[in-house]
Amino acid sequence: MEVWGPDTDRSDRLWVVLLPGLGGDPEHFHWLARGLSASGWPLALVDHPGSDSAAVQALLEGRQSFDGAEALRQRLADLRAVLEAQRGGQLPVPGNRVVLVGHSLGALTALLAAGAQPVAGADQRCEAALAGLPLTNLSKLLQCELAAGRVMETPVVNPLPTAVVGLNSFGGLIWPEKKSKPLGIPLLLIGGTLDLITPPLDEQLGLLAALGLHGASRAVVVEGASHFSPIRVDGQASEEEGDDLFQLGEELVGVNPLTVQQLIALELIRFLNQLEGDPAAGGMQHLSDGTTRWHRLDRSSAARLTEQLQ
């Protein structure tokens, strides 16, 4: 685990736990940790041995198998250990209000830890979802593996998070819209239009409609961004080739990943700043910086859009 101290002091007493996704390492998110700490928030960046890049590389090379349920169980235990260490003073991170930020499986971990209760009937939903190979939503395969592993019934962490931020989050089969009990804390769910692993219509917008009752909850969809856009690998900041599991082509990474990462940091910092004040204006907002377009939606606009397009 890495600890990032703030460049400046804030009065909101917020601190952040950042959880990489499956196959992710802390180094992939140094860009985000740097931006958050520069804005005044202390941060713990968690490493998850057993489901990090080394574990996935071993899986790809046939040296070990992968148990999704066990990986999630271990990630939840890692998160509880971090929170307990901070609360007990063993982790040198100031603050008494925690925000959980996770990418993909890290976001699922954060939602479960925050008290999102899986809806009964996942077996039947999975049977219907997997009747055909879900090529446009590969997360369904992992969702169904986790549902079969009976690992998602987990106690809420202490302290309860002040908010949850999900980058390329998933859970549409776990928390179906109109059947789920919403969370009472703010959610920010960020995705991209080129994400074929956790597509925003099924996953981020669906999750916001299902769980995002709080008035400050938002989804942000970035045009041209993919599932791997939040991951920065060695050499990506220049024209060099990095040596990394996620050294992927544009067709998988999406367009302008560095610009997308800047937008993610911008939206996340905006969200954290607004936790202290009134929720931002609702509805759907269409934004552009001249090179990239993105869309900000509240719960009602996300629900309308998913209903119209399904």
Predicted regions located by residue number:
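Short beta-strand-to-loop junctions in surface cap/lid or active-site-entrance loops
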Residues: 1-12
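Short beta-strand/loop motif that positions the catalytic acidic residue
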Residues: 183, 189-191
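Catalytic histidine neighborhood in serine/cysteine hydrolases
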Residues: 211-233
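Alpha/beta-hydrolase active-site loop
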Residues: 64-92, 121-137, 142, 150
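Short alpha-helix in the alpha/beta-hydrolase fold that links the catalytic acid
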Residues: 199-209, 234
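Short substrate-entry loop that stabilizes the transition state in hydrolases
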Residues: 10-13, 18, 22-55, 173, ...
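Gly/Ala-rich beta-loop-alpha elbow adjacent to hydrolase catalytic centers
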Residues: 102-110
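Alpha/beta-hydrolase-fold serine-hydrolase catalytic core, especially in secreted/extracellular enzymes
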Residues: 225-227, 233-310
